[in-house]
Structures are given as C-alpha cells and as structure tokens.
Design a protein with these regions (language model features):
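Short secondary-structure boundary elements
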Residues: 103-308, 312, 419, 602, ...
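Residue at a conserved register position within TPR or TPR-like alpha-solenoid repeats
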Residues: 265, 287, 307, 324, ...
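Internal alpha-solenoid helical repeat scaffolds
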Residues: 117, 142, 203-204, 293, ...
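Helix-turn-helix DNA-binding segment
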Residues: 748, 755-821
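Extended alpha-helical scaffolding segments used for macromolecular assembly and cargo binding
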Residues: 207-208, 219-227, 243-332, 336, ...
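Structural motif corresponding to the intra-repeat A-B loop/turn of tetratricopeptide repeats
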Residues: 290, 327, 364, 403, ...
Length: 821
C-alpha cells in the first residue's frame, strides 16, 4: 500500500492514490493480502509493520485490517502504528503515551545537543512527547533560533509545527529540485517513470529529484519514489503556488491514463468544467464495473464538484452515495446523500436518494420511519419509472416488517397492487415474471399483516416457487424472497435459496449481502436441529455484519443464538443474546423475547413463560411473526400454568396458519396444541402421523414428550414408553438438556429405568465453530484453497484448523472426514 496524500484539515489535493482496493471488492482484496502474507510465511515467519497507518487510503486500510483480523496459524504478525482515529475494530490495541520529559530531554541531548536550555524546554513542551516532533522541530530552526539569540517561531499544534519544520526544509531546496519534489508529491503513487515524465515536461530532471533525495526528503528505490514521511509530502504539496500546482497536475494528466488521468485533470481545473467532470464520471462507471465502489464513489464526488450544471452535479453526487453504500460506507453515503438532497428537485433523483438514505438509516439500526419515506418516494415515479418504484416498495416492505410497522406493510401492499402491473409492462420477458411475482408477494405480505392469512399465504408461496424455478436476477428481489420462504415454513426452499445466494455472494465478493443470506442459512439449520452448524454460521455472519456496519443484522443473529441457547437450557447465554436482540429492530426483539419464553418453558417456569410469550404476541412490542411463532409455546405454557382458556386464541391462530401454509410439521404442531385442550388422544395420534413426514426434529420430540405424558397419565405406561424414548433420544442429539430431563423423568414414571444422560460426547462438539465449518466443507470434497476462498481465510489457516480437528475427531486423513459431511 501507498500513503494517501490527504492530511488533516483538508489542506492537500484531490489527487490519485494508489489504492490497494482499486481493482476489486475490498474484502476480496483483503483475502488476497491474507493469502500473499500466508504464502510469504511458508518458509519463515513474517512481521508486517505499518507505520502511520492513519495515512493509508480507506481501501488499503480496509484490506490490511481485514487480513489482520483473520490471522491465525499463518506465522504472520501485523503491527499498526496509528493515531486514535484509525479504525481497527476487532484488533487488540495498545495505547502509547508521549515520552516523559526526562526521556525527551535525553533524546534532544543526543540528537540536538547545541540547543539552548530555554529552546530545548520549549521544544519538549510543544512536542507533547511526540518523538517525530522532537527530532524534526530542531532541524527547522536556524542557528540563531537554536541558540536562543533570535526569537523562536510562533507556537503551533504539534502536527502543524512538524509540518512547518518539513516545509522549511522544502523551501531551502533550489527551484528545480523543489519543483521535482512537488511533482512527486502530486503524483501520489510513487511511480518513478510517471514522476520523471511529468517533471521533464516542466523543465526538471532526474538530477533535480536526486537533489531532493540528498536533502533527506525522499528515497528513490528502483522504480519507486517514497517520501521520508507523509508530512513531507503534504508540506511539498502545500508549498506550491497555485499556478505551479495547476501546471503540475496538467503535466501529470498527460503522463498518466485511466482514473489517475481523470483525477489529475480535476486537480488542474480551478473552475467547473463539464469535459473534465464527464471524464471523471466515465472513470467512476468503470470503477463500478470492476467492483471498486470506494474508488467509484470518490470519482463521482469529484465529478459532481466540477459539474457546471446543478442537475448533473446532483446526479453524480447520488451516484457517489450509491457507490458508498455498495462499498459498505454507511456514514459516508449518508453525508453524500444529504448534500445531494439540497439540490435534488425531480422525483427520480429524490427516489434514488431515498434508497440511499433509508439504507443508511436501516444499517445504523434505526429502521423506524424509513418505510414511509421509501413508499412516499415511490408514489411520484410510479407512472414514469414503475420498476424503480417497485424496488422502493420492496425495500419499504422489508423495513416496515422489520420495524413491526404493520400499517406501513399494508400501505405498501396497496401501492404494489397499483404499481405492479405497470412495472410488469415495462419489463423484458424474463424480468416480467420476476416483477409480477414480487409485486404479488408484497400484496400477500400486506394481507398477512392485516390478519388475512388465508389469502396472503398463496401469494407468498408464488414468489418462492418462481424464484426456485428461475432464480431472480435482482439482488434485492433474491434477498426479499428469503423472508417469505421462512415465513411459510418452507425450510428446504429457504435453505436452497439462501445457500445459492451465499455461494454467489462469496464468488462475487458481495460481503454486504452475506450476513442476510447466512442468517437464513442459520435459521434453516436451527429448524433442522443442526445447532452446531448454526452456531458456526452465526459466528461468521456476525463477524461480517460487524465489518460492514450492519447493526440491525447483529440483533437478528443474536435472536437466533438466543433460540439455540433456549433449546439447550443455557440461561445465561440465552439472556445475553435476547438482550442484544432486544436492542435491535422490532422483529429481532420479538424473536429474542420468544426465545426467553421457550427457555422458561423448558425449565418448567410456566407462569413466567406465559407472561413473556403473551407480551411478545399481544403486548406493545408485538410483531406479526411472533404472534404466529410464539403460539405453540404460549399454548403449552398456558395449559401447564393452569390457564387453558388463555391457550384457545393461540391454538386458533396456529391452526389457521398451519392450514394456510400446508406444511406437515406445522399441522402437527397445531394438532399438538389442540391435543393439550382435548380429553382424547386423536389429535396426538394425528400429529404423530404428520411428523412421520419429516421436518423440525425439536418440534417432533416435543410432541412425543407431551403424547408420552398423556399416555402415562392415562395409565398406558407401556404405550407411553415408545414416544418418550424417541423424544429422549432426539433431545439428547439436540443438546436440549432441560427437555431431555423431562423425558427422562417421564420414562422413570412409567416404571422404566431411564438411561442416565449419555456421557458419550459427540466428537463434533469438540470443534470450534470455525473448525466445524472447515471440517464440513472438507468432508464435502472442497480443497483447502476452495475452503479458504469461501470463508475468507488463508489456506494455511484452513490447514491449521484441519490439523487441530483431526485428533479431536479421531481421524488420521482427509478421506475419513466423509462421515462428518
């Protein structure tokens, strides 16, 4: 990576930077860095030092920090030295204070022994213990100032003083070496050939550049020029008169091409210039095409600044904001959108801005109100751009559903019914089906939010089926379909669609979408009873959500983790995750509350379970999804708490829902609830027949447990043992400790000596979440490099985890992993 020319205070130019991430998505570049470091460490350990990391451009910083977070067994150590503002979340930090006065005095005595005592004391005071300042401030003083015979320079902040010190050394250079130094400062990437070509066109030579090197201001190594310190570069650039600066950038524009040419042309343009702005816009579009959103955003912003037309400038600012969102820079996108909003007047640009601003607010964890904003922005463009209007409505529906704003969901459904047909009419053949399905699904979601499950569910089922038959081309549409699949209990469809989207996201480096798809993967794994795999998926999704600033997604992931902990009876973990979910969007908060209710139910705290679940289903913080998914637990808690009348409504809701979605496991659970309120066993028997069709092993085991309890109370002890044994085996496989305890107690009550808790640990339980992911992929036949690419790790880390996993699993070779697929 190269140092960025930008310094504090906006005093340096908008010049090209050699961005490590310019050619690809920042996370894929980070993976490439990790792989490179891993390969370098194959023969011996590597120490990677980054001094002044705060001077790195954002793309380079992202890639390096991404790699650092994933270091494990590579034999690589990375150390960043930076100011506090450097964002290195997830890495251990060691704050460094300035040198104490005694150490500072010793350093000055060694390096600047001729300083008068008052001068030395002032330097110690003004340096604030900064070693760079202690070394450079004396070098900027003339002999009179060093001895105290001349008045000292005016006091400045440390950075300003050091910058001034370097500036004084720049000023001492003759004119042509100073010009050559300025060209190197403006060039920004350190390419010697480019610097020399531009310098030559201005009358400077390689010898002039050598003179700057002899002055200790830069180094020339091979074909590369490097400044002694970023502040030297800033000083050299800032000391250029305006006319020189414009000439330097003009010369550099002639000596370069692509993005750098466009940026140098921009820096050489003191006034708006449409030709230059258009050049920048073309470069930005090319950057978007090669998945470099950060670069594209910067180029679009520069293009906006140089646009003579306000409308063109606004359009380019909107593109800059959109690219910032794509690159995961939420705060930057919000700031750009605010600037664009000051000048946007037409409905189309305002609608595009609405998408950016709503996305930014949602990613910040504040979705409330964004749905109305999106829907309001869709209405004015419905006639002129129904496709964009429908996209806004899809986003609005998702945000409203997450925020628990049922009224907005219904409003969006009404708008979708009006706009959908027009949107279909503007599509080519293939997209028409996708658009029609999505519009219908929005209508269906609105009906469900209004309580009309029977007519809403078929519309949702249609969009899921359409997506499975012919995967949608739009990323927004693909992600939208995942929610209906889960809502309908179509676990196989949800798993299939989410796995395909996750694979596509890994292949294309769409890291921002991965937390969403991995969340759905985890939910389907929980439904299938694969808690270990779900925990590993959640760990990866959580890390990616944090890296991309998706606060709301972290809350949703926490709700799933709370559910797993509830099933397993881990109260501390469940409460921790439920609390995190409670701080997120309404949907996550409600799911976290349902997990707490399940925890209480499993631990036999029926009154508390009833209170928590009743609040989730009908309290002020209710959510439509919780009304359905809490019903079975609420009914069971009510019956056990001696309040069967409070189970009636829950049973009715669940029965209606199960009939609509027509999934065997859901119908079985509805029958189980009905059985709790019925004197006979017909409902239990019917439920067991439906469970035979598969799906949701935890729910089947719960039905078996309740059926066994009923049979035992009916004095049919021998009959009771069959479902109770099956329930116990399932609960033990799931790690559902409190539920297994109940099944064991019921078996003992039938007169059977129930087996003690199996002490036999599943070998997979010995693995860490990451080891489990790697073992599963290796068992499926993936190579180490394939696994590394999928999980954004180095292949050496994959090798290390497999090496650690083999003895834990009791295997000696990769071939033996097949049984763990």
């Amino acid at each position: 990576p190269r140092n960025s020319p930008a310094s504090r205070g906006g005093t340096t130019p908008h010049t090209p930077r050699n961005r490590l991430g310019d050619g690809s998505d920042r996370f894929l570049v980070g993976l490439a860095v990790l792989t490179l470091l891993s390969d370098l460490a194959a023969d011996r350990p590597v120490l990677f030092l980054v001094d002044d990391a705060h001077w790195l451009d954002p793309a380079s910083a992202d890639a390096l920090v991404f790699a650092a977070r994933r270091l494990g067994a590579e034999g690589v150590a990375m150390v960043f030295a930076a100011r506090e503002e450097f964002d290195a979340r997830g890495l251990p930090e060691l704050p460094l204070d300035g040198l104490e006065d005694g150490a500072a005095a010793a350093l000055l005595a060694e390096r600047a022994s001729d300083l008068a005592v008052p001068v030395r004391n002032r330097i110690i005071e003004e340096s604030a213990g900064n070693p760079l300042a202690l070394l450079e401030l004396p070098a900027a003083l003339d002999p009179g100032e060093r001895t105290g015979k001349a008045p000292p320079p005016a006091a400045l902040p440390v950075t300003g003083r050091v910058l001034a010190a370097f500036g004084a050394r720049v000023e001492r250079l003759p004119e042509r070496p100073r010009l050559a130094l300025a060209v190197a400062a403006a060039e920004g990437t350190g390419e010697l050939g480019t610097v020399l070509r531009a310098a030559h066109s201005l009358g400077a030579t390689a010898g002039d550049l050598d003179a700057a090197a002899r002055a200790g201001l830069l180094r020339i190594t091979g074909a590369h020029v490097a400044f002694r310190h970023p502040l030297v570069r800033a000083a050299a650039y800032q000391r250029m008169p305006l006319t020189t600066r414009l000439s330097v950038h003009t010369a550099l524009a002639e000596a370069t091409d692509g993005d750098r040419r466009a940026l140098h042309r921009a820096a050489a343009s003191p006034a708006p210039d449409e030709d230059v702005a258009a050049d920048l816009e073309r470069a930005a579009a090319a950057a978007r095409g090669r998945s470099a959103p950060a670069t594209a955003s910067s180029l679009y912003e520069h293009a906006a600044r140089l646009s003579p037309s306000r409308d063109d400038g606004t359009r380019r600012l909107i593109r800059a904001a959109q690219s910032a969102i794509t690159g995961g820079r939420t705060e930057r996108a919000a700031a750009l959108a605010e600037r664009a909003a000051e000048h946007a007047r037409d409905a189309g640009p305002l609608a595009e801005l609405a998408m950016v601003r709503a996305t930014a607010e949602f990613e910040r964890g504040a979705p409330a109100g964004t749905a109305r904003y999106l829907a309001d922005s869709a209405v004015p463009i419905a006639a002129t751009d129904p496709g964009l209007a429908l996209t806004l409505l899809v986003m609005a529906a998702g945000n409203a559903w997450s925020a628990g704003e049922d009224g907005e969901v219904r409003r969006v459904a009404g708008l979708a019914a009006e706009i959908g047909a027009a949107a279909v009419g503007t599509c080519v053949t293939r997209a028409a089906g996708e658009t029609a399905s999505v519009a219908a699904a929005l209508v269906g979601l609105g009906r469900i939010a209004a309580g009309d499950v029977a007519s809403g569910v078929p519309l949702l089922r249609g969009v899921v089926a359409a997506s499975r038959t012919d995967p949608f081309g739009s990323l927004i549409a693909r992600l939208f379909v995942l929610a209906p699949a889960l809502l309908l209990g179509e676990d196989e469809a949800a798993a299939e669609l989410a796995a395909a989207d996750a694979a596509l996201g890994r292949q294309r480096g769409l890291i921002g979408a991965l937390p969403t798809t991995l969340q759905v993967v985890a939910q389907t794994q929980v439904a299938a009873g694969l808690h270990r795999d779900a925990a590993a998926t959640l760990a990866e999704a959580g890390e990616l959500a944090r890296e991309t600033g998706q606060r709301h997604r972290e809350g949703r992931l926490a709700a799933i983790a709370a559910r797993i902990a509830a099933v397993e009876g881990d109260e501390g973990r469940c409460r921790e995750h439920a609390a995190a979910a409670g701080r997120s969007v309404a949907e996550a908060a409600a799911a976290g509350a349902c997990a707490l209710g399940l925890l209480h139910l499993g631990l036999g705290r029926h009154d508390e379970a009833l209170r928590v679940l009743d609040e989730a289903a009908s309290g002020p913080a209710r959510h439509t999804a919780a009304v359905v998914f809490a019903s079975a637990d609420l009914a069971e808690a009510a019956v056990h708490a001696g309040a069967p009348h409070r189970a009636e409504a829950a049973c009715e809701r669940l029965t209606e829902w199960a009939a609509a979605i027509d999934r065997p496991w859901a119908s079985a659970v509805a029958l189980r609830c009905r059985a709790l309120l019925s004197p006979g066993e017909e409902a239990f028997a019917a439920a067991m027949r439906l469970h035979e069709q598969g799906g949701r092993p935890f729910e089947r085991a719960r039905t078996e447990l309740l059926y066994g309890e009923w049979l035992r109370r009916a004095r049919r002890r021998s009959d009771a043992r069959v479902p109770l044994r099956s329930a116990l085996a399932a609960f033990e496989r799931l790690g559902a400790v409190p539920w297994a305890g109940r099944a064991r107690a019921e078996l003992r009550a039938t007169g059977e000596t129930a087996p003690a808790p199996s002490g036999g640990e599943d070998p997979l339980d010995r693995l860490t979440p990451q080891e489990l992911q790697i073992v599963r992929l290796a068992a499926s036949g993936a190579s180490n490099r394939d696994i590394a690419a999928q999980l954004f790790l180095s292949h050496r880390t994959v090798e290390y985890h497999l090496y650690k996993a083999y003895p834990k699993l009791g295997v000696a070779s990769r071939a033996e992993l097949a049984r763990f697929a």
